[in-house]
Amino acid sequence: MVQIVISSTGAEGLAEWVLMELQGEIEARYSTGLAGNLLGDLHYTTEGIPVLIVGHHILYGKIIHLEKPFAVLVKHTPGKQDCDELGRETGTQYLVTALIKNKILFKTRPKPIITNVPKKV
């Protein structure tokens, strides 16, 4: 299972992320990996159905509301500049940067996108 996070702005001041769940594996074309690279295009139909286009393949998904939302936390460990009035270091703090309330599930196999196949080679 591959999980991908998409960022958007929320109404409460926190970013609201959407979790994308894909079945199977996604392999990078080169050995550099997928981090920081464009995976594909996410679109929505007029009915609100999510459509993911990856290369020459198309996937149809559905939006699922999570019963228990996830919080995205950033760990902040104290340093020399993080001291209280008495010079003692403050403890480790966690900052909530985003909430994940929905996920997009792509559970079907990708369908190839074929356009204009020539009859003569």
From Swiss-Prot:
Tell me which UniProt keywords the record has, alphabetically.
Cell cycle, DNA replication, DNA-binding, Nucleus
Question: What is the residue range of the signal peptide feature?
Answer: none
The domain of life for this entry's organism is Eukaryota
Please state what the protein is called.
Answer: Chromosome transmission fidelity protein 8 homolog
The record's comment on protein family reads: Belongs to the CTF8 family.
- Compartment(s) of residence: Nucleus
Provide the species name: Rattus norvegicus
The UniProt subunit note reads as follows: Component of the CTF18-RFC complex, which consists of CTF18, CTF8, DSCC1, RFC2, RFC3, RFC4 and RFC5. The CTF18-RFC complex does not interact with the Rad9/Rad1/Hus1 complex. The CTF18-RFC complex interacts with POLH. CTF18/CTF8/DSCC1 associate with PCNA. CTF8 exists as a dimer with DSCC1.
Q: Which GO terms describe its cellular component?
A: Ctf18 RFC-like complex
Does this UniProt record's set of keywords contain Ribonucleoprotein?
A: no
Instruction: Report the protein's function.
Output: Chromosome cohesion factor involved in sister chromatid cohesion and fidelity of chromosome transmission. Component of one of the cell nuclear antigen loader complexes, CTF18-replication factor C (CTF18-RFC), which consists of CTF18, CTF8, DSCC1, RFC2, RFC3, RFC4 and RFC5. The CTF18-RFC complex binds to single-stranded and primed DNAs and has weak ATPase activity that is stimulated the presence of primed DNA, replication protein A (RPA) and proliferating cell nuclear antigen (PCNA). The CTF18-RFC complex catalyzes the ATP-dependent loading of PCNA onto primed and gapped DNA.
Lineage of the organism? Eukaryota, Metazoa, Chordata, Craniata, Vertebrata
Alphabetical GO biological process terms = DNA replication; mitotic sister chromatid cohesion; positive regulation of DNA-directed DNA polymerase activity
